[in-house]
A protein has these predicted regions:
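Mature-chain termini and adjacent capping regions
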Residues: 1-176
Length: 176
C-alpha cells in the first residue's frame, strides 16, 4: 500500500499518471468524455494495488471532458485495470456532466455519490439532489440510470420526495 501526501510530489505525479492511463473505460461517459484523459487533484492519495483501489482525500477534483466531481474524498475501484466504480463523499459531494451536446449539464449533489461506470448509473445518498434540463429531484436516495433515462427516488419519514418537472415548450416539440 502506498500513502502519498503533498510532501512526496514526484512519486505522486508518477502514480497519478499511471492510474490515469488505466482509468479510461468507454462506459465512463455518454459523450466523447471517455476519450479524454482523467485528471485528479487532491491533497493525499492512498493506492492499494491488491485491493484494486485508489482513495483520494482533501479537496478532490476529478475532471474528464465535461465530467466534473468535487468531494472531500473519492475512492476509485478497478477490475482488470478498468474503473468500475467511483465513490465520492462530501458535505456534499458534487457531480456534473453534459450527457448530450444539445443539453445543459446534469448536476447532482449528495453526501455520497456512487458512479457505476459499466452500468452508467449514479446513486445519490443522503440529502440527494439531481437537476437535469430544468427538472429537479430531491430525496434521501436518488438512483439515476443514465442509459435508460430513469430516476428512482426514496426518502425517509417525515421527509418526502420533492420533484419539479418543467413542461416542454411548444417550440421544443418537433413536428413530424
Amino acid at each position: 500500500m502506498f500513502y502519498l501526501s503533498n510532501s512526496n510530489k514526484p512519486l505522486q505525479r508518477l502514480l497519478l499518471a499511471t492510474l490515469t492511463a488505466f482509468a479510461t473505460p468507454a462506459a465512463w461517459a455518454l459523450t466523447d468524455d471517455a476519450d479524454q484523459p482523467i485528471q485528479i487533484h487532491s491533497d493525499e492519495l492512498v493506492y492499494e494495488e491488491k485491493a484494486s483501489r485508489a482513495t483520494y482525500k482533501g479537496d478532490v477534483q476529478v475532471n474528464q471532458g465535461s465530467l466534473k466531481i468535487n468531494a472531500e474524498m473519492v475512492t476509485i475501484e478497478f477490475e482488470d485495470d478498468k474503473v468500475v466504480r467511483l465513490i465520492a463523499n462530501g458535505s456534499p459531494a458534487y457531480y456534473s456532466q453534459k450527457l448530450k451536446s444539445d443539453q445543459e449539464n446534469m448536476q447532482a449533489d449528495a453526501r455520497k455519490i456512487v458512479y457505476h461506470t459499466r452500468d452508467e448509473k449514479v446513486d445519490l445518498e443522503g440529502d440527494a439532489h439531481l437537476t437535469q434540463e430544468g427538472n429537479d429531484f430531491r430525496g434521501e436516495l436518488i438512483e439515476y440510470d443514465i442509459r435508460a433515462g430513469r430516476v428512482d427516488a426514496a426518502s425517509t419519514e417525515p421527509e418526502r420526495i420533492k420533484m419539479t418537472l418543467q413542461p416542454k415548450r411548444s417550440s421544443d416539440i418537433v413536428q413530424q
